[in-house]
Amino acid sequence: MFEPVPDLNLEASVELGEVNIDQTTPMIKENSGFISRSRRLFAHRSKDDERKLALRFFLQRLYFLDHREIHYLFRCVDAVKDVTITKKNNIIVAPYIALLTIASKGCKLTETMIEAFFPELYNEHSKKFKFNSQVSIIQEKLGYQSGNYHVYDFEPYYSTVALAIRDEHSSGIFNIRQESYLVSSLSEITYRFYLINLKSDLVQWSASTGAVINQMVNTVLITVYEKLQLAIENDSQFTCSLAVESELPIKLLKDRNELFTKFINELKKTSSFKISKRDKDTLLKHFTYDWS
């Protein structure tokens, strides 16, 4: 009944050259991230499938999570498949559930870390979809204990840093036992540094809690990182007088320098990674080198 059309009965051999995606640049007004507020991104799927597909999209940025942790987060999202959280913007629910789940394991992200790994969440400026508003809504819907995501407890933020510099032999999900001494040391430095700023009336009280924490953590991280690079270059050691109870584990930092550098470079790419020269100079006074 039907006869093939000669012009369409063709065979073609297509050869693709090597393409480096990292070297491509976006066009003007082109955005590498897209989150639809009013339409379903995966309209042919159920809302549950849509959340899991969205989670896959977001979690690829958290390069330091292993397969067990990623699987655990997928199971957490799957556990709330029958819960209607938002009428619109369903896919944005997935990263919030991931953040709250990771926080329940003792790891939180500063504003700069959120911008680095979840820029869609950080750059949301509407009142309804702002970060703190969404956290409160999802906590209520899922039965989590309500409260602010950002609090003056520095250990969870440095626990995320510890996750990023773990070696490949860590056992258990979100396990940072080998790096726990680093978490304690960085936290102690930050607490004492924060108290110094309080006594000197240098804390900007008009800023949000998240902004103050972000400034403190960023200052400590970049200062320790720069001191570490100098110590590696000169084969020396350094100490911080603010780390009284938990000295900085310099050997651990040197051993994990490549991973630490990768994490710091991710933070440096963000617009919120701004360091006050005054704060940094104040903190530098408490660092000394051992050149012997």
Swiss-Prot record:
Query: What's one Pfam family here?
Result: Pox_A8
The record's InterPro entries line, in alphabetical order, gives: Pox_A8
What keywords would UniProt list here? Activator, Early protein, Transcription, Transcription regulation
Would I find Transcription regulation among this entry's keywords? yes
Q: How does it assemble?
A: Heterodimer of a 45 kDa (A23R) and a 32 kDa (A8R) subunit to form the virus intermediate transcription factor (VITF)-3.
So what family is this one in?
Answer: Belongs to the orthopoxvirus OPG134 family.
What is the protein name stated in its UniProt record? Intermediate transcription factor 3 small subunit
- Origin organism of this chain? Monkeypox virus
